[in-house]
Amino acid sequence: MPDAVGAIDQGTTSTRFIVFDRRGTILAQAQREHEQIFPRPGWVEHDPREIWRNTHAVMREGLARAGLAPGDLAAIGITNQRETTVLWDRRTGEPLHDAIVWQDTRTDRSVAALARDGGRDRFRAVTGLPLASYFSASKLAWLLDHVDGARAKAEDGTALFGTIDSWLVWNLTGGPDGGLHVTDVTNASRTQLMSLATLDWDEAMLGVFRIPRAVLPTIVSSSAVLGEARDPFPGVPLGGILGDQQAALFGQTCFSAGEAKNTYGTGCFALMNTGPAPVASSAGLITTVAYRLDGRPPAYALEGSIAITGALVQWLRDNLGLIGASSEIEGLARSVEDNGGVYVVPAFSGLYAPHWRDDARGLIIGLTRYANRGHIARACLEATAYQTREVLEAMERDSGCPIAELRCDGGMTVNDLLMQFQADILDRPTLRPKVSETTALGAAYAAGLATGFWKTLEDLRDNWAVDKRWHPHIQAEERRALFAGWSRAVERSFGWVEENA
């Protein structure tokens, strides 16, 4: 009887395969990085063939390290970097171009042209998304318009489009020899081509971006048996797909409305489950699909993205030389009792949710002769917590649903000082789970549910365990004063970049 589930975690910089047991404990993992390709300023690409080769390799390596055979796996789940766009030839399996990565901004001008007629929110009611080069639709349109023969191949069904999950599933299930061309609802919701109401491709959106329907994958549930793998693990069911941030929400077992998680990495991604109906945002958030279990209604989410959090620590290390390693920031920040009145607003390329101010730029404010390296380090950590509070308050305003606690994951959660201050400034507990790989765990859970390895969502809740919990310690007046100072600092960052400068 199979006693493990495997998860492919295909990220922006690397691909991993992680094997979990029935308790959600990691048995083994393998990882390989792939090349970041920068053909021009603002362009970011990946080689889909390299990603597939690495996926194939880490699957074999990870399973071997676990001491298991393919038959020991009940299912395989997939989680992936979202929005990254692949176009390939279904006859040969060869990409028509390198994948255009979610960070790529080559379509900024075409998106701005669309926004001139109706504004950046003109399609938000249908897709939940503002007009942005971030999402897949404009990237696919660029490929169809700039790759020789691509549009003709797309129109006759010879070319296939997909986000990274689609590319992996197609290759895992046979490639040119009958590979499945599918994507799940979470990834489809990030293309700007899917209707949140119907969970199908929207004909009007296809018309706006001039996308032939024949090029698109079939949209499936996030947890459902899609078929069986053929290579490298013949016969093992493919049971689930989730975009990376939705996978983290699922891995954190945020299955009820009002439950939220925040992933602390280079930036932060906060998601809140809003239940079975989409919640429109008037506070600068994105409305998206959280997940859909096979045969059940979908769960929706509000998402807020913060551009610079962990990257601010890297800036202190690499640009200012205040620390020699990122791990040193906690000790430096603890060398002082508070921020000394110093605030750092990390608007290096503007501010994301909930402000969305392209004209903002970074600042350090509140400096006196009293301020020292420790105060600046502490202010950098506190900036992450302040920005998270702004996003969570926007979520509560949009949804009308209070967030009782925040489940935290990602690399920065090892910083106890940050996690304590996060609880203090939110005035609610923050929790770090015992299993830190929540993104891969979410993909494993989705796949295991589909195959009966886990029976119910309650089985998954029973697996979730707290590694550490932080409760608020500061008084309400101190919290109010600290956040008021942050708000004043943020306002002063606005308008630095002049439109015609």
Swiss-Prot record:
Pfam families: FGGY_C (PF02782), FGGY_N (PF00370). It comes from the Bacteria. GO terms for biological process: glycerol catabolic process; glycerol metabolic process; glycerol-3-phosphate metabolic process. ADP binds at residues 12, 16, 266, 310, 411, 415. It comes from Methylorubrum extorquens (strain CM4 / NCIMB 13688). InterPro entries: ATPase_NBD, Carb_kinase_FGGY, Carb_kinase_FGGY_CS, FGGY_C, FGGY_N, Glycerol_kin. One of its GO terms (cellular component) is cytosol. Its EC number is 2.7.1.30. One of its GO terms (molecular function) is glycerol kinase activity. Gene3D superfamilies: 3.30.420.40. Key enzyme in the regulation of glycerol uptake and metabolism. Catalyzes the phosphorylation of glycerol to yield sn-glycerol 3-phosphate. It catalyses: glycerol + ATP = sn-glycerol 3-phosphate + ADP + H(+). HAMAP family: Glycerol_kin (MF_00186). The gene is glpK. The keyword Transferase applies. This is Glycerol kinase. CDD domains: ASKHA_NBD_FGGY_GK. PANTHER family: GLYCEROL KINASE, SUGAR KINASE. Pathway: Polyol metabolism; glycerol degradation via glycerol kinase pathway; sn-glycerol 3-phosphate from glycerol: step 1/1. Sn-glycerol 3-phosphate binds at residues 12, 82-83, 134, 244. The lineage of its organism: Bacteria, Pseudomonadati, Pseudomonadota, Alphaproteobacteria, Hyphomicrobiales. Belongs to the FGGY kinase family.
